Swiss-Prot record:
SUPFAM superfamilies: Xylose isomerase-like (SSF51658). The keyword Transport does not apply. This is Uncharacterized protein Mb0509. To M.leprae ML2432 and S.coelicolor SCO3347. The keyword Signal applies. Keywords: Signal. The lineage of its organism: Bacteria, Bacillati, Actinomycetota, Actinomycetes, Mycobacteriales. Residues 1-21 form the signal peptide. It comes from Mycobacterium bovis (strain ATCC BAA-935 / AF2122/97).
Amino acid sequence: MRPAIKVGLSTASVYPLRAEAAFEYADRLGYDGVELMVWGESVSQDIDAVRKLSRRYRVPVLSVHAPCLLISQRVWGANPILKLDRSVRAAEQLGAQTVVVHPPFRWQRRYAEGFSDQVAALEAASTVMVAVENMFPFRADRFFGAGQSRERMRKRGGGPGPAISAFAPSYDPLDGNHAHYTLDLSHTATAGTDSLDMARRMGPGLVHLHLCDGSGLPADEHLVPGRGTQPTAEVCQMLAGSGFVGHVVLEVSTSSARSANERESMLAESLQFARTHLLR
């Protein structure tokens, strides 16, 4: 019998609360672990502090998200090459299986030119998997407003339409020919990408899922799974029925929650969705 797929909670899912809140929710609700989003919060950058939280709440760190967002360009320095190296070291120190990283930005030329080789070298020297995540372009239809942009995507049958990609070689990590990938279901919604097809194309290289949802808006939504238009249940069922040996992490936005109870309800609903559709 294949082992159950572990389900984690991203520390980004409790924003604007701090990382400790994610450990607390994960413990209380029954998540199997957390994904550490390294960004502006000082604790997220302090591996010793994160290790203490993990021990205090008895919640392991399953994965580390490298500080590669636009808002975290100065976290752990300004050199993205060194930041990725440090992310892998952090994962090793925390006992995490995976580092999630975005494709390089186009203006990070030196980093972009050596990215594939760096990822391969890091994996060759470590047991940590570096899973490159699918992203999305800047869509021109965002200027038409939410309703119209969603309808335009529906009418064209998916795809971003006229758009500009900030990523090299593209926002599709499969263009980089890496060994391991992260599939994010909010990003597929924003890009108009067929997420089931992308999961199949990633094949055994798919080792990490950001379980969330989206409705086709040009902005990244990170909805609770089941509240958007993505085939979230089908993707989970595909993984459950396969030889998937990675982790599934809920990376959902709860910043709209009007109370602590509402945030907890969103996180509990997300976990229940995952448990239901990942059952083996």
